[in-house]
C-alpha cells in the first residue's frame, strides 16, 4: 500500500496535490466534488441509522420488564416509551414488539443508506452539476444555498409534525401527568395560543422560571411542535422562493467551510438545550423511563421520611429541625409551604406524584395527613434511591443511601453526553468560523506544506 506522503499516489482528484488536503483531512478533499461528498454524507447517515437500529435491538434483547428502564442503562427504549409505544398505565411495559419493529426498520433503512453511500462514494459521478443540475451546487451560489436551506427547513418541519400526528391520531403519547400515575393518551385540545407558546421563550432561564425547559404539560409541547413545524415549513418555502437580501449577502461568509461553521454552532445550541431539557424536565422526559431528576429525587427523599415519621407519630406541621427551621415543612421566600431540610433549595420542583398534595398555598397540611396514596409513597421511595448522581464507578443514588443501586441514571448519561458533545461542536464552530473568515479576508495561509516535517520522512512501507 502506497502512502500519500511521497505524493505519487493519485486518488482521482482526491490527492494532496489536486486538493491541498492530505487523506487525514477527510471530507475537505471533497469540497468541490459534490458527488463524492454526497456519498460521504449518505454513508454517514447509514452509520447513524445502523447504530440506532443495532443499539435498539441490543436494548430489547437485554430488557427486563420487571425492572424500571432507568435501572437498566437504556437510552433508546425510554424515547420509544415516551412516544407511547409498548407501555400502559404507570409507564409499565406491556409489549416489547414495537421496540423490536423499530430496531429492524432502522437496520433495513441503514442498509439502503449504506448502499447509497458506497455507490456515490465509489461508483457514482464525481460531481453532480453536469448530469443532475438540480442536485448540483457551487458553494458561492447564494441562491442555491438558500434553496438547500429551505429544503432542510421543510424536512425539519415535517419531522415536527410527525410527533404532532402521533400524539393526535396514532395512539397518543405517554403523559406522566395522567391521573393515578401516568398513562398513554391522545392529546385533544392543543395549546395554540401564541402568547403561551412564545411566552416560554420570553421567560427567564433561572430558578422557577426555567425558559422553555419549564414546560410541564403535553398540550403545550405538542402545540409548540405545531407552531415550530409551521414556521419551519413556511420559512423553507420562503428560502426556496427568494434570494438573499443585500444585508444578508454582506453579513455572511458564503463558502463551504462557513456553512459548516454555522451548522456546528446550531448543533452546539441544540446540544446545550437538550442537556438542560433532559436534566430538569420530567414531562418531555418522564421519570418513569428516565429516572427522577435531581431535584425530584431530593424532594422524594423528604417526602418519604415525612410519610415514615408521620406514621410514627411525628407532628410534621410543627416539628423543628436542627437549624430551628421546620424539620419536614417550612415556607419558601414567597410564602408557599415547602419541604424543609436540605431539599428546600429544590422547592420549585413539580412532579406528578407530588402535585395532588398541593393546595393554593403550597403543600397542604391536611392533604399530607389524610390524602397520601400508596402509589405516591411507592414512587417517591423508588425515586429517592435513584437520584441521577452516578459516579465513574457506577454507584448511583445518594451516597449515604444504604438502599442505593449500582446504576448511572440515563439522565446523567444523556445530559452529560449532550453537554460535552455540544461543547466540542461549539469549539469546532469557532475553529471553522475563524478559518472561513480568514479565507474570505484573503489571509488564510494554512500549514506550509513544503516545510511540513512529515514530507521529509521515509514512507511507512
From Swiss-Prot:
N-acetylthreonine sites (modified residues): 3
Major place of residence: plastid
TM ranges: 57-81, 122-143, 166-188, 243-263, 279-300, 435-459
Cofactor note: Binds multiple chlorophylls and provides some of the ligands for the Ca-4Mn-5O cluster of the oxygen-evolving complex. It may also provide a ligand for a Cl- that is required for oxygen evolution. PSII binds additional chlorophylls, carotenoids and specific lipids.
Phosphothreonine modifications at: 3
Membrane topology per record: Multi-pass membrane protein
InterPro entries for this protein: PS_antenna-like (IPR000932), PS_II_antenna-like_sf (IPR036001), PSII_PsbC (IPR005869), PSII_PsbC_sf (IPR044900)
Subcellular location: Plastid, Chloroplast thylakoid membrane
Domain of life: Eukaryota
Binding site for [CaMn4O5] cluster: 355
Residue positions assigned to the propeptide: 1-2
GO cellular component: chloroplast thylakoid membrane; photosystem II
GO molecular-function term, one example from the UniProt record: metal ion binding
Gene3D superfamilies membership: photosystem ii from thermosynechococcus elongatus
One GO-annotated biological process of the protein: photosynthetic electron transport in photosystem II
HAMAP family given in the database record: PSII_PsbC_CP43 (MF_01496)
Subunit relationships: PSII is composed of 1 copy each of membrane proteins PsbA, PsbB, PsbC, PsbD, PsbE, PsbF, PsbH, PsbI, PsbJ, PsbK, PsbL, PsbM, PsbT, PsbX, PsbY, PsbZ, Psb30/Ycf12, at least 3 peripheral proteins of the oxygen-evolving complex and a large number of cofactors. It forms dimeric complexes.
Descriptive protein name: Photosystem II CP43 reaction center protein
Amino acid at each position: 500500500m502506497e502512502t500519500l506522503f511521497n505524493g505519487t499516489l493519485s486518488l482521482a482528484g482526491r490527492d494532496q496535490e489536486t486538493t491541498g488536503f492530505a487523506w487525514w483531512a477527510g471530507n475537505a478533499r471533497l469540497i468541490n466534488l459534490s458527488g463524492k461528498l454526497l456519498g460521504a454524507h449518505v454513508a454517514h447517515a447509514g452509520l447513524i441509522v445502523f447504530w440506532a437500529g443495532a443499539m435498539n435491538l441490543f436494548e430489547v434483547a437485554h430488557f427486563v420488564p420487571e425492572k424500571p428502564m432507568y435501572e437498566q442503562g437504556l437510552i433508546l427504549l425510554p424515547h420509544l416509551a415516551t412516544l407511547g409505544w409498548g407501555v400502559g398505565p404507570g409507564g409499565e411495559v406491556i409489549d416489547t414488539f414495537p421496540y423490536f419493529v423499530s430496531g429492524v426498520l432502522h437496520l433495513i433503512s441503514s442498509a439502503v443508506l449504506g448502499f447509497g453511500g458506497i455507490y456515490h462514494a465509489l461508483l457514482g459521478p464525481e460531481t453532480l452539476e453536469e448530469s443532475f443540475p438540480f442536485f448540483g451546487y457551487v458553494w458561492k451560489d447564494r441562491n442555491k444555498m438558500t434553496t438547500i436551506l429551505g429544503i432542510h427547513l421543510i424536512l425539519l418541519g415535517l419531522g415536527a409534525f410527525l410527533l404532532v400526528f402521533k400524539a393526535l391520531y396514532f395512539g397518543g403519547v405517554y403523559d406522566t401527568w395522567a391521573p393515578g400515575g401516568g398513562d398513554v393518551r391522545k392529546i385533544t385540545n392543543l395549546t395554540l395560543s401564541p402568547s403561551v407558546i412564545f411566552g416560554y421563550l420570553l421567560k427567564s432561564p433561572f430558578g422557577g422560571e426555567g425558559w422553555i425547559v419549564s414546560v410541564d404539560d403535553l398540550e403545550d409541547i405538542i402545540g409548540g411542535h405545531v407552531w415550530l413545524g409551521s414556521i419551519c415549513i413556511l420559512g423553507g418555502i420562503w428560502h426556496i422562493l427568494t434570494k438573499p437580501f443585500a444585508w444578508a449577502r454582506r453579513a455572511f461568509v458564503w463558502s463551504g467551510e462557513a456553512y459548516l461553521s454555522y451548522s456546528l454552532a446550531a448543533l452546539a445550541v441544540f446540544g446545550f438545550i437538550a442537556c438542560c431539557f433532559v436534566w430538569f424536565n420530567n414531562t418531555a422526559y418522564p421519570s418513569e423511563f428516565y429516572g427522577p431528576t435531581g431535584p425530584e429525587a431530593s424532594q422524594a427523599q423528604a417526602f418519604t421520611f415525612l410519610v415514615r415519621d408521620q406514621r410514627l407519630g411525628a407532628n410534621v406541621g410543627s416539628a423543628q429541625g436542627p437549624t430551628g427551621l421546620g424539620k419536614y415543612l417550612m415556607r419558601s421566600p414567597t410564602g408557599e409551604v415547602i419541604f424543609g431540610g436540605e431539599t428546600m433549595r429544590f422547592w420549585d420542583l413539580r412532579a406528578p406524584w407530588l402535585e395532588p398534595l398541593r393546595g393554593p398555598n403550597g403543600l397542604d397540611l391536611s392533604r399530607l395527613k389524610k390524602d397520601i396514596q400508596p402509589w405516591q409513597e411507592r414512587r417517591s421511595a423508588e425515586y429517592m434511591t435513584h437520584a441521577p448522581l452516578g459516579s465513574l464507578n457506577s454507584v448511583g443514588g445518594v451516597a449515604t443511601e444504604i438502599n442505593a443501586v449500582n446504576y448511572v441514571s440515563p439522565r446523567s448519561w444523556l445530559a452529560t453526553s449532550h453537554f460535552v458533545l455540544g461543547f466540542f461542536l461549539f469549539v469546532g464552530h469557532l475553529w471553522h468560523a475563524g478559518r472561513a473568515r480568514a479565507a474570505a479576508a484573503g489571509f488564510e495561509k494554512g500549514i506550509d506544506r513544503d516545510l511540513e516535517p512529515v514530507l521529509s520522512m521515509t514512507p511507512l512501507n
